Amino acid sequence: MAYALNFDAEGERFYEVGTKHGVIYPWDTTQQGYGQGVAWNGLTGVTESPSGGDETSFWADDMKYFTRRGNEEFGLSIKAFYYPDEFAECDGTAKLAKGVRIRQQTRKRFAFTWETTRGNDTEGDAYGSVIHIAYGVTASPSSKDNSTINDSADVSDFTWECSTTPVTYPGYKPTSVIDIDISDYKDAETDTDGFDAAVEWLLETLYGKSDIAEFSATATYAKGDLVVHGGSGMEAVYEAKAAISTAGAWSSDDWLKIADGTAVPARVPSISEVADHFPAVAAG
């Protein structure tokens, strides 16, 4: 007998594994937004721990009349061999002087991104990946165990239990975390939906962009193209405001300054920005 459903088909046996490419974006009180991203080296694990959403039953007319669930909360724990210096303020530590820090201070909130690997039975771990972005994260105090060096090769690690405050997005309930599955469109023969460009934008936004060419008076540019312009020590990154179809000398009217230096710093995009760059996903 033939069934309409095909169980365990080749190429459709998926799994998710690993944790890598952790980045934190500490809150900048001056700018009132998330600041420049910093790579979290030594990240060994991220555990998601949602809570809430419990069901409550309501009774009437001697029967269960309806049920209702409470709002969910999103928590996570971060585990690592060590942490970046920029995380210290998020962990309630302030710097008094070089090498001198004081604890039990106000804990700064941050955004956090990490990447997991999505695999299948035919391509293994090379199938794809999922990028996770958490907003409004705060880390709770955590214990740290220091013990004598002995004949074991084990090293101490750190674990932070974190809670989140959700952000709003029109048409949906407030949320603290979004997931972008890069493997969703990997089988498309052509990039008609612009997904490849959207992924490139996402990665360059989350991790920053450094390989930016200098402005050339003999080149033309599309809207959004980036260039480096300025004398030695005065370089800055600029974005084309509109398409520049005629080559010519530099005109400041055509360009918007993005950042000082020769690279665009890593930053965390808002949910609206992600949705705007992934129209097929947003239309869902």
Predicted regions and their residues:
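Short amphipathic beta-strand/extended segments with alternating polar/hydrophobic composition
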Residues: 37-40, 126-137, 181, 239-240
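Tryptophan-rich substrate-binding surfaces of secreted polymer-degrading and adhesive proteins
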Residues: 211-263, 284
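Acidic Ser/Thr/Pro-rich low-complexity disordered segments
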Residues: 29-35, 117-127, 170-189, 247-252
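Structured, beta-strand-rich domain cores
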Residues: 64-136, 140
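Polar/acidic, low-complexity leader/linker segments enriched in S/T/G and N/D
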Residues: 1-47
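Mixed-charge, glycine-accented linear interaction segment located at domain edges/termini
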Residues: 139-210, 263-284
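Oligomerization/assembly interface segments of phage tail-like spikes and tubes
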Residues: 48-88, 152-167
